[in-house]
């Protein structure tokens, strides 16, 4: 039942005996949390957290911080003590020294007329790190060519910072999804890279 201890769409509240921190993913110090509402990596500590990987000290040190904090790889926001999923750390796009969270850009573009679905991925871009690319499925009846990169950027600029705006737009027929309905950004990225290679 809904109540003060539940929020629709939230990950929820930590279990008893479980400590959580939301920290900078590039400098995951449990003593320095990001401000509420800001995205950060979720750290978890408690009796249910495993002690490490069997005979793999390097993987253990990468996953478990001093003090028993587990790096989950989940990018979350905390608001009123509730946690909200933002992205996975491995899907973060690094462009020009800025972190771009694909789900934030996707939400902005998805609200655009003519766009049924969208995935945002990073493509290799030399000195800039990665280029932000949007791959979108158009709504039925949308005229091909009516949803342009310029129109997408203009629409999304009201909701996301300029550095997060896409620099490439691909229109695709169908969005690749997992069996549970999650967008397969890795597959989208491979499709876009294959198209770019064909174009030369």
Predicted region positions:
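Conserved AMP-binding/adenylate-forming
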Residues: 1-83, 89-92, 105-106, 115, ...
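Sparse recognition of residues in long alpha-helices and their boundaries
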Residues: 35, 168, 172, 196-197
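Beta-strand->loop->alpha-helix junctions that form or flank phosphate-binding loops
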Residues: 12-14, 121-124, 170
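AMP-binding/adenylate-forming catalytic core of the ANL superfamily
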Residues: 46, 51-52, 67, 73-164, ...
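Acidic/polar alpha-helix N-cap and adjacent early helical turns
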Residues: 190-200
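Generic structural signal for residues in well-ordered beta-strands
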Residues: 20, 118-120, 169
């Amino acid at each position: 039942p809904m109540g003060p201890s539940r929020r629709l769409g939230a990950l929820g509240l930590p279990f008893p005996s479980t400590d959580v921190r939301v920290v900078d993913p590039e400098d995951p110090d449990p003593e320095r949390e990001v401000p509420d509402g800001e995205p950060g990596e979720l750290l978890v500590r408690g009796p249910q957290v495993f002690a490490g990987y069997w005979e793999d000290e390097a993987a253990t040190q990468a996953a478990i911080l001093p003090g028993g904090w587990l790096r989950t790889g989940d990018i979350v926001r905390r608001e009123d003590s509730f946690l909200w999923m933002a992205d996975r750390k491995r899907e973060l796009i690094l462009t020009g020294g800025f972190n771009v969270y694909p789900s934030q850009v996707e939400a902005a573009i998805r609200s655009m007329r003519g766009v049924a679905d969208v995935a945002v991925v990073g493509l290799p871009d030399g000195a800039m790190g990665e280029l932000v690319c949007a791959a979108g499925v158009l709504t039925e009846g949308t005229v091909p060519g009516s949803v342009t990169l310029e129109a997408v950027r203009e629409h999304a600029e009201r909701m996301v910072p300029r550095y997060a705006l896409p620099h490439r737009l691909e229109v695709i027929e169908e969005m690749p999804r997992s069996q549970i309905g999650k967008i397969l950004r890795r597959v989208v990225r491979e499709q876009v890279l294959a198209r770019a290679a064909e174009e030369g």
